[in-house]
Structure formats: structure tokens, C-alpha cells
């Protein structure tokens, strides 16, 4: 390494010196030099503390100064103007020191001094070569300015040699220090390894199984096990009948303290068995002696001591080792002292109650699996109480049992094994621990199905009728013996008997409940009795449905927060055939019918299927801005009036989803768009009405018919002979292009067929819209704005036929009176003529729909037909 790359030692030491940075500083000067004062933060950074320098001996830069004590001062802040003015420094001089100490600082300070201070002023002396510093290593000050600038002159031969020796000494010291640290590290690792081996040997020698020790001499808290739920059915089983009490006794031979005493052999009588054991072990080198500890007596942990043979580390005499092991076991067992023997609390046995379930108990099953399956994964364990082989199979089975189609099943269907039900869960809990094996837990206490609860209650009430008490308790054996013993007819009879018995029980229960309220029941009216009974049975039916099979197998019951609203049923009454019955008899009959209805409702409610879905809520129609803009454009295009026909057309053009009524669109236009009905003149309205009348069906035919009737009346007796014989005119009287002409039924005459009672909805003609040229009925095909030509033609033909028949019936009954003196009311039609027009329309519809003949002479039948037609609401006009 070349000498040119070596920095002088004095420079290195100066660079390692302390640098103090002053944020706010001031100057104190005298005749010799000046000192710096400032404030720096303390080591904690919580407060500022004042720092004063020694006499400044060197200026490196305007902000870096060096004092005689060997400290550097970095002026990072500003000068304290107020303090300097207070000390008598003029402002112009303070401005010169605003950016640090200038090069002419001595002249500036000299100009500030008084005459006396100037006479005593002496030049600033240079700092000594090596200032005294509290450092352990040799430190030299900075070189002189001549040496720093000279380059080659500052490094003399002696100085180089001295620097080399110092570097070698430092390297030697550093090498020795590293070797010492490495040696200490290796010794520490060896000591840690030795301690670890000692602890392992002690653990192998101390082969006692120990329970967790109590801290600070407190008694051991007994371990508690909790069974069942936290609220109900939980009980605590304590391991100890009472807390064991520590008692000082002889030291156990398995403890390390006793082994240490045996090894020492001082002031102790060593048994011969232990002496022989020590003599055998004397061949091996003794293990390192552990640290001395206090004597350890038999504690709570020794209650669980189970001695075992320590692992052999060397070849021993087998007979001698066996003797030593047994002697050690005897010594351990002889040295234990108990105040009382720990015992387990056993609850007194429950009374011998027969289990309600005919399924055999598994008394050997532990409760640990139950606890684990209950608290870790409740529904995923196949062996737990809640698991089942196939949830879908059980659910479909419940749905099939709840369907309307009832099938007679064996009475023991629930208790017989099905083909795919081998791994199905049991209907009852497993047997509990001692003294609790006969405990019954109904499935209604857990999230189980109501089906098993219902059958279990039947077994509890009528167990003798279902099985032989001396018979087997297994389901399969019981089902096989029953199938072999009884025939199919016997099973059906027993099933019916069970149903009858349940109905009798229900009837008795209802009668008991009615007797309690019989006194107040007599004073009530029949209507209130009917309503209250219906409401009561609606509530009970709902409860039965909630407890039925559909809410079982893990499905929780409905919460009480949302209860169904029961609608009161209106009791429909028919007029009594015999009005001479007394009120008491009527009330008695009413009670009997109510009782029958209750029985029927109960039997139906037990097996009524649940609705698979709820009635969907009507979708709320929202009118957005784009919908309102479209409606605005349609209204501007169509300019509708207040008529329904105009708004129907607006609704069709708008095609808003969910809107089917034109009144809704009209109200939206009024409320949201501020639409106002346009005002029209009477003349314009009359013209529109005339145009509408001309557009209506049959208007042209009616005008032609009136003209022809007027001409015939004016001609007199020039009528044809066939007009006297037939009330229906022939096809010759009409031109082919006439709207009122018929092409099929009128020419061929309507065939007379037998009268049919009733009719279907499909046979009713669609009702035409009066203001629309196109007819629309209830059928979906007629609601379409675009109809096929064939359908439109058929509809037009049918209506032509109806209008023609109505006009034929509207004529005067006799055409023989050909007087020319008839007034206008004669041929225009009077009151009777208008009545016959309505009747003719209705009868024409009857002919088309039902194929019936017209009997004009039967007035009663006409009245009945009028009533029927009003009920069917098939009138055209």
C-alpha cells in the first residue's frame, strides 16, 4: 500500500472529532479572542440546552470553527441579533455576521471595541499541537496550514515510520481482540451444549409422568367436563372428590434430589437394593453434577406417577437390572402419602324407565365423538346424530307422504329399515354416561323432524298395540315377524283402526274444550260463532303445519317475528228449505256441522302440502325520464282526447312494460307531464261523432234497410208473395257488394238442432270495440293489432250475419199495411222496434253460439234468455 494513499493520523483524529451544530448562536469577545454560545437539543430531544465553546483558535469556513478544546462548531442557524445588540454590537457589524464568520472578523471585532479594549487587544494565538482530550487512543491535532498545503513536506520519514508502527500495533490489538471474542463464543456454545446434555440425562433419569404443577402453592383446580347444552341438561363431572392437600413426606426415589443424596452417601442410610444399583452404575463415568436445588417432596404431580424402566445405555446384567427396577417401583409406591384417596363423583342411578325407542342402544359408544361432532363439524360427520345417508332421499320421501294421493302404508313403516336407509341417523340420542343411559331426549328438543315426534308420541301412548313387549327391540326383526304373522287384510284393518282411534281422541279433545266454554257459547250469535271458530281453526291448522314434516330434518321453525296474517273466511249460508225449524234445532245443527268441519279441517291440515313458493309481489312500475319523453312524443303525435280509444292507442304505441291499462297512462300524463284535455267546439264534436257512426259496423246496412223499407211503404201493395210466407228475405234482394249480405248461413237456412244447455268460454263471440274499426275480444289472438286476413274475414262474416238477423227482427211484424199516410216515426221505428232490435241481437248470438231455435211465442223463455245473456255479458252494442 503506497504512502500517498495514507491520510495523516492527525487528520484522521480531527475528522473523528465531535461536531456541534448551533441553530441560534451568539459571540462573546474580549481582548484576546471570542467565544461562541448557542443552543442544541438534549439526547432525549425534549428540551434545548445551552452550549459554550472555548476560545476559537481556527476558522475553516464561514460556518465551521475549531476551538482550543478540540471541538468543531457548525453554524447552521442565524446569529442572535437581540442578544448581540444588548451586548453593545452595532447593527452594521451584526449584518456582517449574518451568514457566518467572515474572513475579516478580527477587524470587525476590533472596530466594535472601545479605546481601553483596543489597548489591551492582543493577537489570537494558534492552537497547541496536541490539545488535551479525554480519549484513550493517541490523538493529534490538525496539521499546520503549511503542512496541509505543502503536500510532500508534511510527511517526513520519522512521521511515516511512526504511523506505520501505530498501524501495526492497532492491527495486532484488533486481531487479539477478535481471537478473544471467538474463544469466548466457543466456550459459551460448549457450555450450552453441556447443559443441554445434562438436562436430557436428568429427564431420562426422572421417568415420572407428571401433571401440570400448580403455581405459587395454590391448590389444584379440579378438571370439569360439561355435557349437553349450556342452558339445559348440562352437568359438571369433577375428577377429584376433594382437592388433594400437599403434605411433606419422604423424598421419592425417582426424584433427582434423592438420587443426588444416594450418590453423596453422607448422613443417609442407603438400602442394599440401591447400593447394588449404584455399584452396577459405578462402571460408567458419573454424569456432571446438576446445580443444587431445594429439597422436593411428593407433590400433586406425583399422584399420577407411573414408573417405567429407564432406557439402557450400556450392557447390564439382566437379573440385576430387573431387581433394581422392581425395588425402585416399591420404593416409589411406599413413599406416597395421601390424605384421602381421590375418587370420581357418581350420580345415583336413575329409576329403571324403559326407553321409548325400540331401537337398541349403543352403550359402548363414547361421548367424545359426540362432543367432537357437536362442536366442530355438526352437519358434516357421517357418524353424528344429525347426519343422514341421503338428504335428498329423505326430503323426497317427506314430500311424497305429504302429497294429496294417499296410500295405505304399514303401521310400522317408520320403524322398519328401508332399502337405502342403513346409515340413517337414529331418532333418539345415544346413551349418556353412567347413571344416564335411560335418559330420554325427544327429537323435538333438537332440530329434528316433526314426523318422528308424532310417531314417538304414539308409541309412548299405545306401545302395547304396536308390538309385543316380549318381542325383539330391533326394527328389522319386529317388522319381519309382523309381516309373517299378519296378512295384508289384517294390516289394513289395523291401519284403519289406528286412524279411527286418532279421530276419536281428537273429537273427545274438542268436546272437552267446548264444554268449558258452553255457557258463554249460548249467548253468542251464529255469525260470531262461525267467524271465531273459523279463525281459531285457521290458527290451529297453521300450528299443525308448522310442526309437520315439511319443517323437519334440520329446517328450523318459522320465527315469531313474522307471523302469517289469517284472513277471515266469510261463512256462506244457504236458505233453509224448511223455515218452520226452531232456533234451538238450527243452532244444534250448526254446532254439529261446525264440529264436523273442525274434524275435517284437522285431518286435512295434518296432511296438507305446503306451498312451494310465495305469491310474488307485484313489480313496481317506475317511470324514468326516457319513458316520460316517449310518452310526450306519442301524445304530441296522436293528440289524444279524453276518450278511452285514444289512450288505448297511446298505450299501444308506448309499449311500456307492465302497463296494461290506458287510464294509468292518462293519469301519468296528467300528473307528470301536466297534460290538459283539449277543448273542442260542438260542431267539431258533432262531425267526429258522425264519422264514428259511419265507421261502425252495420251502419251502411242499416241505412240501406231504412231506405228500402221507406220505398216499399210508399209503393203500397206491390210486394212479393214470398214476403208473406217467410219473414226472412232471400239473397236476390241484396247485391253481392252489399255489406249486409250473407254468403253461407242465410242462403242455406239455419238447421234446427236440439237445444244444448250451457256452453264453453271458447264459444262466446268476442265483444267488438265500439270506437275501433277492428274488433278485439277476450281471446289472445284478437288482442293482437295485426290479424291474419282469414281470421278478420271470418269475424266480419259472423258479425254481418248477426247484424242482418237483428235488422230482420227490427222490422214491423206485418208488411200488409201499405198506407201512404204513415208518419216518420212509423218507418224509423218506435219503442217496440228498439226492443225487438236488442232481443234480435241476443237471439242471433244464441243461434251462433248454441245452435238453438228462436221461439217467439214464449215470453218467459225470452226473459230467461235475457237474464242469461246479461250474466254472460256478451252484448255487442
Swiss-Prot record:
InterPro entries registered for this protein in UniProt: Knl-2-like_dom, Knl-2_Myb-like_DNA-bd_sf, KNL2-like, SANTA
Q: Acidic residues bias located where?
A: 856-871
Sequence ranges of Polar residues compositional bias: 251-279, 573-583, 775-785, 819-836
Q: Does the keyword Protein biosynthesis apply?
A: no
User: Listed disulfide bonds for this chain?
Assistant: none
Q: Which domain of life does the protein's organism represent? A: Eukaryota
- Residue ranges of the SANTA domain? 20-107
Gene deletion effect:
RNAi-mediated knockdown results in absence of hcp-3, hcp-4, knl-1, bub-1 and lin-53 at kinetochores. Also causes defects in chromosome condensation and aberrant meiotic and mitotic chromosome segregation.
Does Chloroplast show up as a keyword for this record? no
Q: Where in the cell is it found?
A: Nucleus; Chromosome, Centromere; Chromosome, Centromere, Kinetochore
Region (Disordered) location: 122-315, 338-535, 549-604, 757-785, 808-877
Spans of biased composition, class Basic and acidic residues? 156-199, 359-385, 394-444, 453-480, 592-601
Locate the coiled-coil region(s) and give their ranges: 153-211, 491-549
Known partners and oligomeric status: Interacts with hcp-3.
Q: Which function does this protein serve?
A: Required for the recruitment of hcp-3, hcp-4, knl-1, bub-1 and lin-53 to kinetochores, kinetochore assembly, chromosome condensation and chromosome segregation in meiosis and mitosis.
Task: Give the protein name, as stated in the record.
Answer: Kinetochore null protein 2
* Organism annotation: Caenorhabditis elegans
